[in-house]
Amino acid sequence: PWQWLAAGWKDLWQTPAASISYGLLFVIMGYVMVYLVESRFHYALALTTGFLLAGPFLAMGLYDISRRLQNNEPVHLGHALFAWSRNPLPILLFGLLLGLLMIVWARLSAVLFGVLAGGRELTLDPSTAQLFFSGSGLTFLLIFTLVGALVAAAVFTISVVSIPMLLDRKTDFITAILTSITAVRANPGPMVMWAALIVIFTGIGLISAYLGLAIALPLIGHA
């Protein structure tokens, strides 16, 4: 994984304009999410974790930039934004699958928050903090984290290889998913470390008021 990051760092600074511009789109998306949820804590947490789930699909343009660099092809932001056109139908179907998983996660989140809050809306205020640090709140956080980790692991397993493969070859999305699953099963150690690094770098980007995503996500995407 560290070699992947080194390669990603190299690609990032070979095409800084296209890569960072693409990363800034994630920053804008982050601010749009903040605006939409306002102070509603449960929506904010669900959307943030959903953003992580959609990350592999959203980073498709960065994969294409690295592919073009490897093949000595010209690179600009337009190529990244329309990377899906290389293999549109399988990529669309894979995107729909990820969208379905995000909907499932959103519904699970709503149910879990409903149980914790007793049906009332959670907002960013001291009473919500007290609720989360109560006995039931800590239990909720544990369950929420475990369920979220399972969903995230499933998404990572089916997408870590599949999306780059769909861009590189004219293959169907089922074959790409099965190949991704096989790769994860064959290399559990490096894949777990890579998943952890993705969470760490994305987390740094999120807690830096989303600005860090302009560098963190292109770095991960190129790697």
Explain the meaning of each model-derived region.
Residues P1-A223:
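Hydrophobic alpha-helical membrane segments
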